[in-house]
From Swiss-Prot:
Alphabetically ordered keywords of this record: Calvin cycle, Carbon dioxide fixation, Chloroplast, Disulfide bond, Lyase, Magnesium, Metal-binding, Methylation, Monooxygenase, Oxidoreductase, Photorespiration, Photosynthesis, Plastid
Superkingdom of origin organism: Eukaryota
Main location, first listed in the record: plastid
GO BP of this protein: photorespiration; reductive pentose-phosphate cycle
Record-given protein name: Ribulose bisphosphate carboxylase large chain
Entry binding sites for substrate: N116, T166, K170, R288, H320, S372
CDD domains: RuBisCO_large_I
Pfam families listed in its UniProt record: RuBisCO_large, RuBisCO_large_N
Cofactor note: Binds 1 Mg(2+) ion per subunit.
Class of this enzyme: lyase
Annotated function: RuBisCO catalyzes two reactions: the carboxylation of D-ribulose 1,5-bisphosphate, the primary event in carbon dioxide fixation, as well as the oxidative fragmentation of the pentose substrate in the photorespiration process. Both reactions occur simultaneously and in competition at the same active site.
One example GO MF annotation: ribulose-bisphosphate carboxylase activity
Modified residues (N6-carboxylysine): K194
Length: 460
């Protein structure tokens, strides 16, 4: 008689991994998944399957389970609630013991939590809505290279949002002409200009030429305005070694900031670059190219607030966060929810803003949200009100599309911003009086008046 000392076969996940009586620990990583089970699969089984497949489980019982303590290491689905207004959708809450994750590795955290489970047959769809990162795990990350306060001190710019501009056309300019556009924008009054996310090192403009001409533009604009200026030099490359080579060259030129596409570049590369930037005094601007592939579907994928939290752990000083302006009111609350998760040290659970867990960042530096995409001077009051001082407002077409050229476009944006900040400080209501504030300012700024005229037809 052969006895192997364990019961072979396939058993329901919920027998092991659904534990509604479990009390979460302060050291657990908590996840909120939006689960859409296949017809006939009970939500408890679906939630337990997610917990199992993203932690210690496999599809059948294995004898090596007896060589470890599953109770210590398994993920647990500890609560399930139906999603209001959606048929057959549930929020499954899963707790993971901290021992399952390598310290200081966003890569490992995601490989575990979202690595395999999304292709699971028992589920029609699955979306990771939020993560609670416990302080014990947060403390294993360096986080942003510098954070909001250090950035302000480096740039000597306070009590207002920062202004940026993406250089367009994004592909096709020679390095010399590119540098010229950078100079004109910075000279006109912007704080930053930006490489587009897909500007790396192409035949029409190799990275080293671009870096040199942009640095020249930067120093010329600084000398003429007396303000510190920056251009986000995109260091994203095909290998980590090449990426760091570009960052090192930027540091040798003495520029203040470099840039990385963190999703296409990957978290491992991003964390390496963030460490280099802190060690060498460079700020790090992060672009989220590819995010919509992951976060756009409402019932499948990963919500951007999770990608934003992951970036704060991996490291970056700025990240693109959408604009809110002109979108629906509900979107505004959700966006401001993850903007707070980027900037603040402690964020309370607030389901109306999409925040499923209270998050304590235990003094990990904050990140400036970057509002960019289809915005112009008429949006300035709303942007100033919504995002507040700790933000970067980026106008690409809204600068370079000015009828008189790049420098006047920059002047128009700077005048509009200063007018909005002054009006706010005087106690005026930007939401109600915004258009009036811009009109008043345009009376003494012909550049702003021309910008107002060009974009007056474009409604919020």
């Amino acid at each position: 008689k052969a006895s192997v000392g364990f019961k072979a076969g396939v058993k329901d996940y919920k027998l092991t991994y659904y534990t509604p009586e479990y009390e979460t620990k302060d050291t657990d990583i908590l996840a909120a998944f939006r689960v859409t089970p296949q017809p006939g699969v009970p939500p408890e089984e679906a939630g337990a399957a997610v917990a199992a497949e993203s932690s210690t489980g496999t599809w059948t019982t294995v004898w090596t389970d007896g060589l470890t303590s599953l109770d210590r290491y398994k993920g647990r689905c500890y609560h399930i609630e139906p999603v209001a207004g959606e048929e057959n959708q549930f929020i499954a809450y899963v707790a993971y013991p901290l021992d399952l994750f390598e310290e200081g590795s966003v890569t490992n955290m995601f490989t575990s939590i979202v690595g395999n489970v999304f292709g699971f047959k028992a589920l029609r769809a699955l979306r990771l809505e939020d993560l609670r990162i416990p302080p014990a795990y947060v403390k294993t990350f360096q986080g942003p290279p510098h954070g909001i306060q250090v950035e302000r001190d480096k740039l000597n710019k306070y009590v207002r949002p920062l202004l940026g501009c993406t250089i367009k056309p994004k592909l096709g300019l020679s390095a010399k002409n590119y540098g010229r556009a950078v100079y004109e924008c910075l000279r006109g009054g912007l704080d930053f200009t930006k490489d587009d996310e897909n500007v790396n090192s192409q035949p029409f403009m190799r990275w080293r030429d671009r870096f040199l001409f942009c640095a020249e533009a930067l120093y010329k604009a600084q000398a003429e305005t007396g303000e510190i200026k920056g251009h986000y030099l995109n260091a994203t490359a095909g290998t980590c070694e090449e990426m760091l080579k570009r960052a090192i060259f930027a540091r040798e030129l003495g520029v203040p900031i470099v840039m990385h596409d963190y999703l296409t570049g990957g978290f491992t590369a991003n964390t390496s670059l963030a460490h280099y930037c802190r060690d060498n005094g460079l700020l790090l601007h992060i672009h989220r190219a590819m995010h919509a592939v992951i976060d756009r579907q409402k019932n499948h994928g990963i919500h951007f607030r999770v990608l934003a939290k992951a970036l704060r752990m991996s490291g970056g000083d700025h990240i693109h966060s959408g604009t809110v302006v002109g979108k629906l009111e509900g979107e505004r609350d959700i966006t401001l929810g993850f903007v707070d998760l980027l900037r603040d040290d402690f964020v309370e659970k607030d389901r109306s803003r999409g925040i499923y867990f209270t998050q304590d960042w235990v003094s990990l530096p904050g990140i400036l949200p970057v509002a960019s995409g289809g915005i112009h001077v008429w949006h300035m009051p709303a942007l100033t009100e919504i995002f507040g001082d700790d933000s970067v407002l980026q106008f690409g077409g809204g600068t370079l599309g000015h009828p008189w050229g790049n420098a006047p476009g920059a002047v128009a944006n700077r005048v509009a911003l200063e007018a909005c900040v002054q009006a706010r400080n005087e106690g005026r209501d930007l939401a109600r009086e915004g258009n009036e504030i811009i009109r008043e300012a345009s009376k003494w700024s012909p550049e702003l008046a021309a910008a107002c005229e060009v974009w007056k037809e474009i409604k919020f």
